[in-house]
């Protein structure tokens, strides 16, 4: 009998210890049962809550979007645009014509220095047709030569005027076209407000916005768009970053 009583006491003691450990585990780590958090999950949630309450948002990648400008550089408006982008810490992509780059090389150098992408928009804004392939090709080459002389680098991105392109140039010239996903038709509107509304209504992550840096209304709209979308969590990057994603 004494032996049986001793075994019973041992079982009770072991059960008490197990219950105690279980309760300690609940206090320290939580449990999966009943939908509660495990220790690892609980710590992660607490960390997120601490970050949020401390003013630090959860680790979410910023939404990228790209501003692109055609036909420049313009001696007045491009400078104003570059000033505004620098103040806001925003990057852009400039698809310049060879003839304007030759006239204003200091603006091309500033674009390069401030981290913007510089692309080819042909020499004289020629549109590719079925009858002028070689002339178009020569304009691409001439503009590349102009830009390399100014910057020391070979452009690899081209914005073909009106979107007309021949994929054969990609092999021949090692150049790649950049089109757009948002066209607010700024070239035919003197109202910056209208341009802004068209862009904001279509703004999405990884969007490529087409504008022209030769109109005052376009510059005003562009800087407003940067302010507005930055406040929504967007970051303005060169178009190369968008194309790498896509």
Language model feature labels by segment:
Residues 80, 126-235, 240-246:
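Catalytic domains of cell-wall/extracellular-matrix polysaccharide-remodeling enzymes
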Residues 43-131, 135-136, 142, 146, ...:
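Active-site beta->alpha N-cap acidic-glycine motif
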Residues 1-65, 83-92, 205-246:
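Terminal accessory/targeting
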């Amino acid at each position: 009998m004494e032996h049986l009583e001793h075994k019973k006491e041992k079982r009770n003691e072991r059960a008490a210890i197990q219950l105690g450990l279980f309760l300690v585990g609940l206090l320290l780590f939580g449990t999966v049962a009943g939908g509660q958090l495990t220790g690892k999950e609980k710590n992660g949630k607490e960390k997120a809550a601490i970050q949020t309450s401390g003013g630090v948002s959860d680790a979410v990648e910023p939404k990228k979007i790209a501003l692109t400008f055609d036909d420049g550089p313009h001696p007045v408006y491009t400078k104003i645009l570059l000033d505004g982008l620098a103040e806001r810490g925003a990057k852009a992509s400039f698809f310049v014509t060879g003839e304007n780059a030759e006239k204003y090389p200091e603006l091309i150098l500033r674009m390069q220095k401030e981290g913007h992408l510089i692309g080819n928009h042909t020499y004289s804004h020629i549109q590719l047709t079925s009858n002028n392939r070689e002339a178009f090709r020569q304009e691409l080459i001439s503009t590349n030569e102009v830009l390399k002389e100014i910057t020391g680098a070979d452009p690899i991105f081209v914005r073909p005027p009106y979107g007309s392109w021949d994929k054969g140039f990609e092999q021949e010239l090692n150049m790649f076209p950049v089109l757009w996903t948002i066209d607010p038709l700024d070239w035919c509107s003197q109202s910056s407000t209208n341009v802004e509304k068209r862009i904001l209504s279509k703004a999405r992550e990884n969007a490529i916005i087409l504008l022209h840096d030769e109109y005052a209304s376009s510059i005003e709209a562009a800087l407003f768009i940067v302010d507005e979308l930055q406040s929504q969590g967007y970051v303005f990057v060169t178009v190369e970053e968008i194309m790498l994603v896509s």
